[in-house]
Amino acid sequence: FCRIVAGQIPATVVAESVNSLAFRDIEPGAPTHVLVVPRRHVPDLAGLAAASAAELADAVALAAQVADDEGLPGYRVVANTGEAAGQSVFHAHLHVLGGRSLTWPPG
């Protein structure tokens, strides 16, 4: 994701803030599936929380903005932290999922 933030890899950016970038997932798990990433590299959500509560709050606020911009009546925000939780890209990120009924538990 560092290369996307740097503009070296194309992405469909839907929103941004000073500290975060939001772009569409290339393998969406829902009709709306957007990733919100911090602009600086932090490997996972726990690392982001430890490094900067303000940057974590910024990412969560941008996720809410994305949901509003997309007109989602309901949405889910997911952060997989660690390989055992399904994290496959080790740059902290939030998944914003919506556009259909989401069941629980997710998987």
Locate the predicted segments by residue:
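HIT superfamily nucleotide-processing domains
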Residues: F1-G107
